[in-house]
Amino acid sequence: MKPGSPPHGAVMLAGLALMAVLASVIFALSRSAVVSADKARSMALADASAKSVATWYAQVLNYDAYTNRAIAANEIMMAQAVTMVAWTQYVEELAQNIGTVAALIPALQPVATWVQQVSTVTHQLATTGALLEVPLRSAYTRALQSSQSIMHTSANAFAAQALVNEVVWTGDPRFFGQLIASTSPSSFFNFTRNFTGEERADFASLIRNSQDSYSRQRGFTQRLYLMPTVSCIPRNLDQAFARLNRRGGTWLTADLQDWESADTLSIHTWRRRSRWNPTCGGTGESIPLGWGAADASVSGSDGMNEDPAGLRVNPSAFARARDQAVSIPGYLGLSSHRELTDITQQARRDALIRVPVLVRLDMGKIAKIKAGSKVFDAKASGSETSRAAPLGDALWSLGVAETYFLRPPDTLGGRSEREFANLFAPFWESRLVLANSADRAVAIALAQARGNK
């Protein structure tokens, strides 16, 4: 063949063959790229939808923790209100009794009168505030508990599936996602429940322990050095003087239906052992100086039902406090609350919720590439360990997430021990995890069942 002459014969055939090979390679690469992109998108959508549901569950559980804390805080605030009413009544009675004594000293009368007026106004303000505050706060605790039930009712299996659909279809409307039954669809619903009746005992203990020390129990016993013992022969220094006994406290009753508070102050003097033994034996209440009591109860009845603060040390003052107790209506009792269904230590250690999601893309929806008049369907070759693989007439991906409890180390206050799952600390989180054998078995069964149709 002369230089510059057009190609012909075997050279032309070789060129056409080379062009065909190049076209086939380009097509194969394009086909592989399309399927690889859909495979990656399928895995991403499975992970995103599973993580979204697990995060939603974590948010609901954290809401339970915050509302449980809010219920406890409102109970403590009601206890403080009842404490203020009892204490201001106690101060008012004490001021009046001191004023009676001060009336014998003209120079002290103006001061005593001013103290009486201030104490009376303070008690009236405290009572008015408590009458408004206790019903509102008690109703608010009921609203918080109701909101917990509403949140858990809304977080059902149908809503979780709707969230999966929203995440998947927002990412790519060609895909379809579903929660699979390797984990019970009602696992989140059964994970927690309302604690009522006697089940609230631990919650009540938490509230009692959260009271400040003064509200919980306030009292002292002091010697009155200005009041020496004259009715018997002292045998030691302590018996040489009278005693000033102060007792008071605020408590939630055992039936969890009342907040009670009382304060008493009395002078105790030493008594002789017997008519024939003039030495000092024991003390007895001689002069009640101050008393006050308040009761916020479901029944609205006056009086003290219990005495965990030792108020009966001053029997006369305590009797007057009970007779004059201020009744604060509107308290609805300790609210029920949400807690883990199984509160054993082992269950709380292993508490978590698994969310497995299977995402499907029908092969008919995978992009198709035409070469001349022939249509080539994109097919992927996935290994058994791949989370996205073709089976039957669809591409399948499995994503699994967990809702779990983990308190950050910097919030443990230097403690080395681990805090187990509970609904009082808002540290519920979500994470992606590997599928287990049950997840894979259910996913394969669903894929095969669809392929056999």
List each language-model region with its residue ranges:
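Long, compositionally biased low-complexity segments
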Residues: A72-K453
